[in-house]
Amino acid sequence: MSNSEHPRLGAVFQKRVKQWFEENTKKEFIIEKKLPIGNPPKDHKFDIVAADDTIAIECKRYTWTETWNVPSAKMGTTNEAVFYLSFLPDTYEKYVVMLKTVNKKRNETLAEYYYKTNRHLLGNVKVMEYDPELDMMRLIG
């Protein structure tokens, strides 16, 4: 797959996650919504935010490498998303939603691996795993 395909696939994944949350929470969601974070406040664009500002979601459509290794740079980007979410008020439900991708060598998904190795950084950010083939979401941890 060419690198030019990745942004399109990421956008499709983001839309599917948005639809899942709308169907399962009965709320309206906005894609790429800016919210103020930090002090002094500066706008940051979050992938998906509930219209009533109660839920914020960052989507990560990452897979294992071709040789079934951890995509370590992408895990760093996921930590960055958690960092931004952590600046939102505690009134928000905060999620990182990852694509379900199974490593048969390790017998674990990338979201399971991420949670296992980074749960000490998560605070009140929840990790979820979305399977677009089955339209199923699973809370990790």
Residue positions per predicted region:
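Acidic-basic catalytic patches of nuclease active cores, encompassing PD-(D/E)XK
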Residues: M1-P36
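Short, well-structured alpha-helical interface segments that form or flank functional binding sites
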Residues: V12, D43, G76-E80
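Catalytic phosphate/metal-binding cores of nucleic-acid and nucleotide-processing enzymes, i.e., regions
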Residues: K18-T25, F29, P41-D43, N69-V70, ...
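Acidic-and-aromatic substrate-binding clefts and catalytic sites of carbohydrate-active enzymes
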Residues: I37-P41, N103-K105
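Flexible, charged surface loops at secondary-structure boundaries
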Residues: P41, V49-A51, L88-T91
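Active-site beta-strand-loop-beta-strand hairpin of nuclease catalytic cores
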Residues: F46-R61
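Catalytic cores of nucleic-acid endonucleases
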Residues: C59-Y115
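Domain-level recognition of nuclease-like catalytic cores that cleave nucleotide substrates
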Residues: Y95-G141
